[in-house]
Amino acid sequence: TAGQLKAGAEETIYRALAIRHMELPVGEFITDALEKNVPDSARTLLESNVKDEVKHDLALTYITNAIGVDEKAEAEAFRLRDAWEAHPDHTILKALVAERAIFFVILPFFRFCGDSGIRTVSADISRDEQIHVACNSLVCSAMGLRPSNSLDKLRKATINWIFQPLGINTTDKYLDKNFWLDSSDRLMYEGKAPQLSDTRSARMPAFFEHSNV
């Protein structure tokens, strides 16, 4: 059953939930990568990660069954998903950027602003996603992959759309759009978001912290 969402965060929560439609495509990105020149040492873990994405999609679907969906947000999320699928960057790179700089921002948002059901599911997913990002980071490093400027622009467009309903310079930082946009930028470029230190998603390796030699 639905619980109480944080006042002022409702529309953004529905947009963030709509991004669940990217869970399975991220799994497909990884599956596609397994058919290419992925290091054998990473294959077993990557295959496990794909199974996790299916579980995440199912768990988030339970949440939407309880609290409902915003049909406009759902439609826009499908359009964003299509843009991610069509983007030419390597599939494992798309998975890494989506998980680290989008999912790692949405999950703390859920934990600060969602009801008890959303908070529980997001905590469970966060544990898996940390393993996914660490694994994908190492694979991208081993393959010498770095995100293109256009993939970064797609990341920015996605995160901006999710948090667009929030205000700016609000007294509650968790209702401040810039707080979350900055978190995404820092996770993307620095691999850490100190402002998310209350969560387990505050520190992941940045692209430049892995040697591509």
Task: Report each predicted region and the residues it spans.
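Non-heme di-metal
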Residues: 1-213
